[in-house]
A protein has these predicted regions:
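Generic alpha-helical structural element
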Residues: 15, 19, 101-105, 178, ...
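C-terminal helical "tail/cap" subdomain of flavin- and related membrane-associated enzymes
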Residues: 190-319
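A structural signal for well-ordered alpha-helical segments within the folded catalytic domains
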Residues: 24-28, 109-110, 183-187, 254, ...
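Long, contiguous hydrophobic alpha-helical segments, chiefly transmembrane helices and signal peptides
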Residues: 16-22, 26-30, 46-52, 79-82, ...
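Short secondary-structure transition/capping segments
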Residues: 30, 89-98, 169-177, 241-259, ...
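Glycine-rich, flexible loop segments associated with nucleotide phosphate handling
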Residues: 7-12, 159, 246-252
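FAD/FMN-dependent oxidoreductases across multiple families
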Residues: 99-220
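Predominantly flavin-linked oxidoreductase catalytic cores and closely associated redox partners
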Residues: 1-118
Length: 319
């Protein structure tokens, strides 16, 4: 190790845990030594913009209103509010990378505010009489789902080296799963280290348990990315005629999905089940094995389309 401007120091350890995040340099260093690390990488095709705000003196956080949610998806824009401490909060806006005109406009902080105030669920937070900005609008791209394999054909690329969290597996940050998957992954590693002493066996079992615990989360996130990409591209072509599901199976899935969204707004049992998935307290969709969730969701069949739509301007109105 070498501190900036200081002397180099050698540290010896039984194991190395790489928690360096998505930009960890250890992967490239291993590759430079000849290691083969295979990676699954999928582009989310979005640009992520945010701006930070603070509530004005005497203004309280808006009450949560299902009719005007502070998070949502208009197809061409995804948005969300992230409350902080002391009246501070952030607003995020995600736009498909090919929406060049919209992306150019939203870089301007005043335009960012105008767009946010045109969305009822955000205006409740960022209206001129509610909050003031504490930063300009800023963004980042290169948003990918990635899975790096440190075991290939049951052969570890390195012994006593363990990548955890985003250094090994990451999903679209829009879903807010990074900290949770990192914690799950760390517990998986701790258990492996406690149960197994062989460096080789530790690597193999850690890889297997990573697949068991994180692959369902990764697949669900990736599927959501693909759906969002398809919807955004379709709206760029013709937002007045969104794609309709083809085939009886897809139509039924869409019908049930609309009912599920409506049920999470109006049935506490369904909401609790959905939140267990959202907060990664169980594997994605596990709550759907509860017959009560199915039964209660079916009551909303045919009632979950229009009522679940997020209020906001059309793409044409924004442009």
């Amino acid at each position: 190790l070498k501190q900036r401007g200081g002397e180099s120091e050698q540290l010896l350890a039984d194991i190395v845990v790489d928690a360096g995040g998505r930009n960890s340099k250890q992967r490239d260093r291993l590759r430079d030594t000849g290691a083969t690390i295979e990676s699954e990488v999928d582009d989310a095709e979005i640009i992520y913009y945010t701006r930070h705000y603070k509530l004005l003196p005497g203004v309280e956080e808006p009450e949560r209103d299902p009719a005007e949610p502070s998070t949502g998806d208009l197809g061409f824009i995804k948005f969300g509010v992230f409350p902080g401490d002391g009246g501070h909060f952030a607003v995020i806006v995600c736009i498909h990378r090919e929406e060049t005109e919209l992306l150019e406009a939203i870089r301007d902080s005043e335009t960012y505010d105008r767009i946010c105030r045109s969305i009822p669920g955000l205006n409740r937070w960022v209206a001129e009489d509610k909050a003031e900005a504490t930063t300009g609008s800023f963004g980042f791209s290169d948003i990918h789902a990635a899975w790096h394999h440190y075991v290939t054909d049951k052969k570890p690329v390195a012994l006593n080296y363990f990548a955890v969290g985003d250094a090994a597996v990451r999903t679209n940050p829009l879903y807010g799963r990074g900290c949770s998957t990192g914690i799950i992954h760390a517990h998986v590693l701790a258990k492996v280290l406690d149960e197994i002493s062989s460096p080789h066996d530790r690597a193999i079992v850690f890889d297997q348990r990573t697949e068991e615990e994180l692959r369902p989360i990764f697949k669900a996130s990736l599927a959501d990315d693909k759906k969002a990409i398809k919807r955004a591209r379709a709206m760029m072509v013709d937002e007045t005629n969104p794609p309709t599901p083809k085939g009886a199976r897809n139509r039924l899935q869409t019908l049930f999905g609309n009912a599920m969204r409506e049920a999470t707004r109006k049935d506490i049992h369904v909401l609790r089940g959905a939140m267990r998935t959202v907060n990664l307290m169980e594997k994605p969709g596990e709550f759907m094995k509860d017959w009560r969730v199915i039964a209660r969701t079916l009551r909303f069949i045919g009632r979950g389309d229009g009522g679940s739509r997020v209020l906001g301007p059309s793409r044409g109105e924004i442009l």
